[in-house]
Amino acid sequence: MACKTLTCSASPLVSNGVVSATSRTNNKKTTTAPFSVCFPYSKCSVRKPASRLVAQATGDNKDTSVDVHVSNNNQGGNNQGSAVERRPRRMALDVSPFGLLDPMSPMRTMRQMMDTMDRLFEDTMTFPGSRNRGTGEIRAPWDIKDDENEIKMRFDMPGLSKEEVKVSVEDDVLVIKGEHKKEESGKDDSWGRNYSSYDTRLSLPDNVDKDKVKAELKNGVLLISIPKTKVEKKVTDVEIK
């Protein structure tokens, strides 16, 4: 077991009625001196497992499907989809390890998408209601599930209606925009205004059908479904000489 040394200083105790800090017995002046204290410590640390909840849309709501606009513009210029570069931080995700090792696999793109969304939504103050009041746990306001036939995305947007959300596909970039404005008036002629907005841009993999993207908003939860296309692998035998 190792020890750490803590260096600190101690001063004489002064009480009421004491005129000076000089000892009456030996007439010597008391001074402050440093001393050392050793505390044993262990290098072992305990990490608490992170809890993860998934939001589900339940009940009836007037919000239905959200229109998805697709636009292609490959004539000159680069793609205007912007990437956000901040510290990487990932949450739990079921990803095949082969997809992470294969540089040509679409799962590599999906991993980048999740990292981007995690950085975009790491500020939980953007939209309220990200904490479970019953357990006090904080859940991610987004989720992605990669199936064999489609990619499913979930975004929590409490307080936003269908008219305040826009989903579009620009070339190979999925664009999600939301804007919410609300004015409140109180007593004594006081009033306030709430405003929240965001613009998310995600690069889509090559093995998806960008013309058949579907979006639906229910109970403040945006659900996006992107069907996959079948990619035939071309195999060519190489003669060994």
From Swiss-Prot:
Mention one GO biological process in which this protein takes part, according to its record: response to heat
* Compartments, record wording: Plastid, Chloroplast
Keywords, A to Z, come to: Chloroplast, Plastid, Stress response, Transit peptide
PROSITE patterns, alphabetically? SHSP
Q: Which CDD domains match?
A: ACD_sHsps-like
Give every sHSP domain span.
Answer: 133-241
Q: What GO terms fall under cellular component here?
A: chloroplast
The record's annotation in SUPFAM superfamilies points to:
HSP20-like chaperones
Pfam families for the chain = HSP20
Domain of life, per lineage: Eukaryota
Keyword Electron transport attributed: no
> Mostly located where?
plastid
Is Mitochondrion among this UniProt entry's keywords?
Answer: no
State the family named in the UniProt similarity comment for this chain: Belongs to the small heat shock protein (HSP20) family.
* Protein name as it appears in the record: Small heat shock protein, chloroplastic
Organism, by scientific name, is Petunia hybrida
Q: Which gene encodes it?
A: HSP22
